[in-house]
Amino acid sequence: MTLQSDRADAADAAGVEVRIRGVLQGADPDAVWAVGGPDGPHAGSADGTPPLDVGALMPVLALWPVIGSLVAEEALRLHTPLTAYGVEAAAGTTAHHLLSHSTGPAAHTSLTRLAEHLTGSPLAELAAARVWHPLGMTGTGFADGTLHAPPADLARFLGYLLSPAEHPLTRAWITESLRIRTGELTPARGLLWHPAPYGTWSYGETPTVWLSPRLPRWAFLLPTHPPGPLRTTFREAAFAPTPSL
């Protein structure tokens, strides 16, 4: 017998899909997108899309989980200065500072150099061995100087982050990353992730991924052109409460 809560969840998922398709129909009908939960995708653009250029998501798909795995192994402490590990950095710079207060290529380069120094392996190999292969992200990898991944692999990654599984990333790392780490400073940040309305966390501008541990729900949007206001309207459609009838 179908429980009332199951019917409500199904109705909510259907409502989210209708809202998203309505938003994209006029703004970017060819955008690649999906929304789902820890059990997998609930709706999205056409299945079977080949790997896409997701280089802008490299920090969250490769660097952030690799750093998390090093923390779990106690090979890295977030508040220890990078110079203590033999890595060149400004005095007092820590991995925590780079993840929560710094943005852009310089911070990502410093963290990549740290991970590669601690392990003796390039980031591409670390991410594949520690994260992508364990999650079954067989289509994800670096090629032609950038990161490529099919939508199905993005769904696997985001769904895992909302699941109770402890491998390849620990719940502690995910939970600690999705809380404010900047105190009263603005803009507020977690560990790489940015807080957003409706209890969501996001990374990226074009493309963008979102997580809501509370719902639990994830979403991603890979637009065909700079999204402008579409990024906000897509998030609203995916995560704003469904109006009561």
Name what the model sees in each region.
Residues M1-V54, T119, A143-L245:
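Catalytic loop of the DD-peptidase/beta-lactamase superfamily, centered on the K-T-G motif
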Residues I67, L98, L111, V131, ...:
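Residue-level preference for non-acidic, small/hydrophobic
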Residues V60-P65, T93, T109, P151-A155:
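A structural signal for well-ordered alpha-helical segments within the folded catalytic domains
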